[in-house]
Amino acid sequence: MVTWLLIFLLILPFAFVLLYGAPYLPTRRAQAKQALDMLDLQEGDVFVDLGSGDGAVLVEAASRGLICYGYELNPFVWAISKLRTLKFGKQVHIYCRNFWNIPLPENTKGVFVFLLDKFMSRLDKKLTRELTKGGQLLSYTFQIPGKKPAVVNRAMFLYKY
């Protein structure tokens, strides 16, 4: 009985995030590099990863000199991302919180997201309200319904808006 309870408690955070975004899928370093290459960001720009998982994209962004913010609901992968980004100090801020309830940081220039298709319209509304003028969105796998991406990387299913 205790074993089943422990298994349930371990699986619960991974299943819970499906209500608000997408399941945890690790991003490889090469994928993070390719993704960030698509964004026109300069050292010191504010970058946000909505559903930051294990912090792979944040590590790559911070290594480019970006000021990074990550939001992750799953406490296990959030803890991993905190550990992975310790070397960047105050350059990287990671929160175990629901990004739907928090405004984007001031002067956000770039946003990376992997969300399920059903959340993309809601994300578009949030970014229309909160993203800095000229800010960029890079979506992994899913497009915003009714909007044409400015750039598409079909090999990696990346869509830049």
Please place each PLM-identified region on the residue numbering.
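A short acidic, Gly/Pro-enriched loop at the edge of an enzyme's catalytic core
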Residues: I102-G110
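Conserved class I S-adenosyl-L-methionine
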Residues: E43-G53
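Conserved SAM-binding motif I beta-strand of class I
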Residues: I67-E72
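Conserved SAM-binding loop of SAM-dependent methyltransferases across substrates and taxa
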Residues: D54-L66
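Conserved SAM-binding loop
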Residues: S81
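S-adenosyl-L-methionine
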Residues: M1-Q42
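C-terminal substrate-binding/active-site "lid" region of AdoMet-derived donor-dependent transferases
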Residues: K118-Y161
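Conserved SAM-binding strand-loop segment of SAM-dependent methyltransferases
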Residues: F88-F99
